[in-house]
């Protein structure tokens, strides 16, 4: 059934408060963007759902990355990772981004190369998001076959029916700023409707040398025709540049320099004798994203309509950007550090880097560089078509069947930007390129390309069918069953390792599929039980097909398989609600890559480990109580047990001939999965002191938190120790907001204080060789910090 976004928002809230008797489980569609958004309604859904409306998103947004707006959700761990603007990670039920599906208005936006999600490329979403639904475990969309941990479904704002304009600004104590303006035309003559949003971020985060310059925009244009037809156009983008903290810290370094320490920058002396900051880590990216959608609603068959709905969306994105990088043939830039006791201690001494480069004895071409600065450039063109139709059979059943095709064309290359006092860089094609010298000049200067020039072209196709059926006199039993088939073909091109005539690889292809289903039974007016399960035979990401860094297709590629199951109880009364869920997920035949410089019998090789299994299970609980509009209390708990389940042997192949070179054993059985806390507790309180004046606070505790690690590094049969266990920590945040009117102008003022207790804690980290604090490295979070701002509404 077609719903406007205002109704979507109402469903998101009301589904936890009352029994909705109408079926909105089948694709709820944005009225503004007219996209089948695969939003589920908790009143009738057999999935574990968390809905975050725009008010809550705005409360969480200031100074935070996009994933951090999904806070206080059991089983979800989202952090800023490095402390740099936009750099973020999210884990759901212990699974990383590769096992989390991200949908934008129902369209998958996770990368096809590795499943990764570069959140800084989507920072504009913070100001353009109307609601987020987190669907843990089995996702509601048949296009989310990587929804093992769960699905994050993002809904963007849309034009309102009446004219509306708002503007806002916030500032963080660390020095970050955001300003935005949002205008909606309201209904225009002949069925048109337009909304515009623009925003700008500037300043810096709490991390040293972390300047920000990021814009964002969203344009939405609707056209309503007669007889149930609509067209919608959206344009979304976020051109950004930000300095990064790209190197993790040790306990010793944090003790010396503090949690804001950033090893990626230093000081350089200018020609006039002044000193200026210079960094090795900066990212710039821009990904304009466009959609054009046609939707049709023929009306319900029991209301005189034909019972058909159809949605066709074409989308297109052009991505272009990159980041600072460096190449070295000796002592790397990071080894030139100001010593203790001097000004700038712990930071890069750029003058020493340049002096070391210039000290090399010149040859016929001049001074040969030991280090050079480069830009590592990457981009892609992404285009696709999503088409589905829904046939309703009264209020008892419906079937949704559809197709999705996507082409993903990528490229990456590296360009010299600074010779650092030398005259040239020697690109050793004889050793580095499979093609050898091949008539190329190894003497390189500023603007020349080195080391990398390749890309991939991938086609991905999915066909699916999804049915919902209600049974019983009061429709108290709801069944869901869906199946999908998927296939991919891909080729890789490489102009560094091959000639123009031989640049394309052979074609690689795989097929997969999924089956998912669920059942919900209403026990009474306020309570229900539900269960769901799924099985995925998932085509590996394209990085698995070309794991050797050249055009040789990896041998013996197999699909990953995922088996999921969940059982839950949901209670929703007028002022009280609760939900308890038990889940299990088995991930089989995971493929992982070793470091490119692992040494087997003194030969540097890279190997792929296949057949690793992991088992995640646990339970989650939510409770809430409210008294009219004056008080609301929420509490949650999540306890999991996530472990790797087997030891495996990996065959090492020659990277060019693919002939076997030997084997290596990996011992991971029983080790805890790292990178997210396996125990979480939390509570929040909201209290209305007076009309328009609200106070809120939230507390979270994270424990049983093991550091991230690569199972492929566990090649010692006697090394069975768990990765380093990061100390548990708790956070207390609070805020106050006031809303009112000055004449006809709406005004909202807010102030938030995060980490009130000034806790020192680690957000993310990597295990070391001793599995103890002496070899651990990670990212420490900010201490006590605040943000404040205002919003004006006309």
State each model region's role.
Residues 236-237, 276, 287, 531, ...:
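Conserved C-terminal beta-signal and adjacent last beta-strands/turns
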Residues 305-315, 325, 522, 528-534, ...:
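Membrane-embedded beta-barrel scaffold of Gram-negative outer-membrane proteins
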Residues 395, 473-474, 582-586, 607-712, ...:
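Gram-negative outer-membrane beta-barrel transporters
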Residues 26-61, 89:
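N-terminal periplasmic "start-of-domain" segments of outer-membrane beta-barrel proteins
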Residues 222-224, 230-291, 324-374, 437-444, ...:
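Acidic/polar loop-and-plug regions of large Gram-negative outer-membrane beta-barrel proteins
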Residues 138-141, 151-187, 198-208:
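Short strand-turn segments of transmembrane beta-barrel domains in outer membranes
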Residues 89, 108-136, 155:
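Short acidic/polar hinge/loop motifs at secondary-structure boundaries
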Residues 380, 392, 396-398, 404-408, ...:
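Structural signature of Gram-negative outer-membrane beta-barrels, strongest in the C-terminal barrel
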